Amino acid sequence: MDKIDIYSDGACKGNPGRGGWGALLVMGEREKEIFGGELDTTNNRMELKAVIEALNLLTRPCEVVVHTDSQYVQKGISEWIHGWKARGWKTAAKAPVKNVDLWQALDAAQARHKIEWRWVRGHNGHAGNERADALANRGVEVAA
């Protein structure tokens, strides 16, 4: 099984506002950069979109380490999602889960992979995270 590191980030100018997502995929010596943007979005949606887009590029099951500076993504996918699904995509307070479309897409995208979700402190000199941040900001610039 191939081993991949994914560094993902989202950015938003205004929240909601113009946003971008970016991801760096690293497999051994090979790297791939991806990014994109949306005009009317939130930082959390862009954080989720970055991981979804990166995972959807993988053509076969892989061992993946996802590095994200978003506790929303890291805790959501590794802790909260189980309860949400059990409650029919409702929170513990019985409210609809925010960004449910993207959470469902992420749940589907991660299903065939073995994934370790790692939180990294943002803007702290972590090379992969800094590159993902730069890609997310490029996504903001191209948002249309």
Swiss-Prot record:
Assembly information from the UniProt record: Monomer.
Iron-sulfur keyword on record: no
A cellular component term, taken from the record's GO annotations: cytoplasm
Residues at which Mg(2+) 1 binds: 9, 47, 69
Protein task: Endonuclease that specifically degrades the RNA of RNA-DNA hybrids.
Entry cofactors: Mg(2+)
Assigned protein family: Belongs to the RNase H family.
GO-annotated molecular function: magnesium ion binding; nucleic acid binding; RNA-DNA hybrid ribonuclease activity
EC number: 3.1.26.4
Designated gene of the protein: rnhA
Entry protein name: Ribonuclease H
Lineage of producing organism: Bacteria, Pseudomonadati, Pseudomonadota, Betaproteobacteria, Burkholderiales
Keyword vocabulary terms for this entry: Cytoplasm, Endonuclease, Hydrolase, Magnesium, Metal-binding, Nuclease
Origin species: Janthinobacterium sp. (strain Marseille) (Minibacterium massiliensis)
Residue positions binding Mg(2+) 2: 9, 133
Cofactor binding description: Binds 1 Mg(2+) ion per subunit. May bind a second metal ion at a regulatory site, or after substrate binding.
S-S bridge residues: none
Compartment annotation: Cytoplasm
Keyword match Nuclease: yes
Class in the EC hierarchy, top level: hydrolase
GO biological process entries: DNA replication, removal of RNA primer
Top-rank taxon: Bacteria
Pfam families given in the database record: RNase_H
